[in-house]
A protein has these predicted regions:
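ATP-dependent small-molecule kinase phosphotransfer cores
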Residues: 29-122
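NTP-dependent small-molecule kinase module
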Residues: 19-21, 137-199
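A glycine- and Lys/Arg-enriched "phosphate-lid" helix/loop adjacent to the NTP-binding pocket
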Residues: 94-165
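Conserved phosphoryl-transfer catalytic core
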Residues: 21, 25-29
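Walker A (P-loop) phosphate-binding loop of P-loop NTPases
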Residues: 10
Length: 199
């Protein structure tokens, strides 16, 4: 089983992933915990480039998208697909839905570019995607409390409003796969809500 976790900054994805990871391990199941961008040594290097705040040069939106997909291709081939072949459960902090929300809805890139990349480089989609939804201000306050903000976290409120709208669009278009979780609840309540969808 392949499960991805989506949402804007500070909505509690990491906490939920840990809880679900523990839940499956207690059932004796083998679980692979991973993230995007990242998940392999090479993809983590790309992640560092993507998140770094560079005051000397602004990264173009196309460059950002292509770097994310370079990391994703490596991640799929080296981690996700081998784990699924071995009947392991894969829990990924973000996947392709993040690219639609951040790069298409947030940055304004065309959906055609994303579709082309997905058709060529994404051979497997999650069975379940949890979208943790909370007011943007709440998530950003949580992100600031964690310390120094990365390149994405430093974006304006208007950007994250568009990102959230992107996630909402996906949720409405694929309700069978994408499950919206109310991330204003306590971590335990969010976890219990997620378990209902996992049976």
């Amino acid at each position: 089983m392949f499960i991805s976790f989506e949402g804007t900054e500070g909505v509690g994805k990491t906490t939920l992933i840990r809880k679900i990871h523990q839940h499956f391990e207690e059932q004796g199941k083998q679980v692979v915990l991973t993230r995007e961008p990242g998940g392999t040594p090479l993809a983590e290097q790309i992640r560092s480039i993507l998140l770094a705040v560079n005051h000397d040069e602004n990264m173009s939106h196309d460059t950002e998208l292509l770097l994310i997909y370079a990391a994703r291709a490596q991640h799929l081939q080296q981690v996700i697909l081998p784990a699924l072949v071995s009947n392991k459960i894969v829990l990924s902090d973000r996947f392709t839905d993040a690219s639609f929300a951040y790069q298409c809805s947030g940055r304004g890139l065309s959906q055609e570019k994303l579709q082309l990349l997905n058709q060529n480089f994404v051979s497997r989609m999650p069975e379940v995607t949890f979208w943790l939804d909370a007011p943007i201000e709440l998530g950003m306050n949580r992100a600031r409390e964690r310390g120094a903000l990365d390149r994405f976290e430093q974006e304006k409120l208007s950007f994250f409003t568009k990102v959230r709208e992107g996630y909402e669009t996906l949720w409405k278009s694929e309700p069978e796969r994408i499950k919206r979780l109310d991330a204003t609840q306590s971590p335990e309540q969010v976890f219990e809500q997620a378990l209902q969808y996992l049976g």
